[in-house]
A protein has these predicted regions:
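Conserved short submotifs of the Hanks-type protein kinase catalytic core
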Residues: 60-74
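Activation-segment/catalytic-loop signature of the eukaryotic protein kinase fold
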Residues: 56
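Conserved activation segment of eukaryotic-like protein kinases, specifically the C-terminal portion
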Residues: 146-159
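Protein kinase catalytic-loop region centered on the HRD/HxD motif
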Residues: 99-109
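AlphaC helix of the protein kinase catalytic domain
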Residues: 75-85
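Activation segment signature within eukaryotic-like protein kinase domains
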Residues: 93-94
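AlphaC helix of the eukaryotic protein kinase fold
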Residues: 24-43
């Protein structure tokens, strides 16, 4: 949807410049998503686990978003490459990305596309959440998922895939999928299509608990992940702050 460029100001301070692809210049839906994501980022407020917002606007018809520059790789790149930054800091990364989501929720927004590709990690293991194009305000009560807000099927909650009412708990499910994958290098509900993924989410007969792939995982950490992955949103954590506290206890006791 967009390219990221390195930009500098008159003092040579670096920034990350996100520009919408030229081929989407006249795509109204894509433009709305880009602007919405920029506006939501501007409203989330400063936080150590969220990419810093500078400004957004339009120059000669081209939409842009200017952000803090962070020299980093995304989380998927790190675990695909077995990067030592991840291997040495996995516990803190798990907590930091959860705290980023917690800050979003506390400020009234849900991400709706939380996945490893949208988590940046620097060489000193500092985490930043990015890409808020699909984010939306948290509704007062679960509302029907938009068919025009697809997300990424492998990380979507069952209610998202079915187009049923959604709430902030879809982010908790997506976090559980991401944490499971990070710790096992496997997806909890593998499938080539949204239908196949949804079928695995409902029929758990083939589900493999993460400790079967990674026996070094603390049992209490597995409990946190399994609660995040509950099919029924009411059985997941009611709010992500509770999950963060249990995650911290599981990883640092």
């Amino acid at each position: 949807m967009a390219d990221i460029w390195l930009a500098t100001d008159e003092r040579q301070k670096p920034y990350a410049l996100r520009r919408m692809h030229e081929r989407l210049r006249f795509n109204l839906l894509a433009r709305r998503r880009f602007v919405r994501g920029a506006e939501i980022l501007s409203k989330i407020g400063d936080h150590a686990r969220i990419i810093g917002y500078v400004e957004h606007g339009k120059i000669k018809g081209q939409l842009y978003l200017l952000m803090d520059y962070v020299e980093a790789s995304n989380l998927k790149q790190l675990y695909t490459q077995h990067d030592p930054v991840l291997l040495e800091n996995v516990a803190q990364i798990l907590i930091d990305m959860a705290e980023g989501l917690e800050h979003m929720h506390e400020n009234g927004f849900m991400h709706l596309d939380f996945k490893p590709e949208n988590v940046l990690v620097t060489r000193n293991a500092s985490v930043r959440l990015v890409d808020f194009d699909l984010a939306e305000p948290i509704p007062e009560k679960p509302r029907k998922a938009s068919k025009k807000n697809p997300g990424t099927p492998a990380y979507m909650a069952p209610e998202q895939l079915q187009g049923e009412p959604i709430s902030h708990r879809v982010d908790i499910f997506s976090y559980g999928v991401s944490a499971y994958e990070l710790l096992t290098n496997q997806k909890p509900f593998p499938g080539e299509t949204p239908g196949e993924i949804l079928a695995k989410q409902f029929d758990r007969s083939g589900f493999v608990p993460p400790r079967q792939y990674n026996s070094d995982m603390p049992a209490n950490l597995e409990k946190v992940i399994l609660r995040c992955l509950e099919r029924d949103p009411e059985r997941r954590y009611p709010f992500i702050g509770m999950m963060v506290r249990e995650l911290q206890a599981a990883l640092y006791v």
